[in-house]
Amino acid sequence: MIDEILRDAEQRMKKSIELLRQELAGIRAGRAAPSLLEHLEVNYYGTPTPLNQLATISAPEARLLVVQVWDRNAVSAVEKAIRQSELGLNPSVDGQTLRIQLPPLTEERRRQLVKLVHEEVEETKVAIRNIRRDALADIKELLKNKEISEDDERRAEQRLQDLTNRYIAEADKLGKQKEHDILEI
């Protein structure tokens, strides 16, 4: 039962870290990266659709993204989604191809992005701690129902804490990496 609780907690913590990876990939660093636009939602025939399901995104140059839209009718919807995103990008349309020149990041914008990274990392750490809290409650419930001994409870709590520390360290590492990428000129 304890192993099941810990396994469930670890799975949920892994999902939190994966979500953080996706969020950080969407935050622009100094160079163009297709991941910046991949999960951008496009209103495609009334349905929110990720951009990577409507187009091929590439970065042929350090400050240029090229979006090759597969459906001619979706070009204006893709352009609108990119313009309205919080990324501050201005695509130029050439047939079914959108070219997006990325302006160099100003020092102020870099600081804003670093702040955003810190917020995302903190959100993930809070989510991980909430997962720990839920698992602890489950362990306490087992003790209360006399399904485990106090020694088992203490060992389970220690294993859970080790798990929590590992995933929080992972979140911090991802945040520091992204911060370094943003501040790198």
Curated annotation (Swiss-Prot):
Chief location category: cytoplasm
GO biological process entries: translational termination
CDD domains: RRF (cd00520)
Subcellular location as annotated: Cytoplasm
InterPro entries linked: Ribosome_recyc_fac, Ribosome_recyc_fac_dom, RRF_sf
Cellular component aspect of the GO annotation: cytoplasm
Superkingdom to which the source organism belongs: Bacteria
Keyword Cell cycle annotated: no
Tagged with keyword Cytoplasm: yes
Keyword terms of this UniProt record: Cytoplasm, Protein biosynthesis
Function: Responsible for the release of ribosomes from messenger RNA at the termination of protein biosynthesis. May increase the efficiency of translation by recycling ribosomes from one round of translation to another.
Family matches, as NCBIfam families: frr
Name of the protein this chain belongs to: Ribosome-recycling factor
Species this protein is from: Thermomicrobium roseum (strain ATCC 27502 / DSM 5159 / P-2)
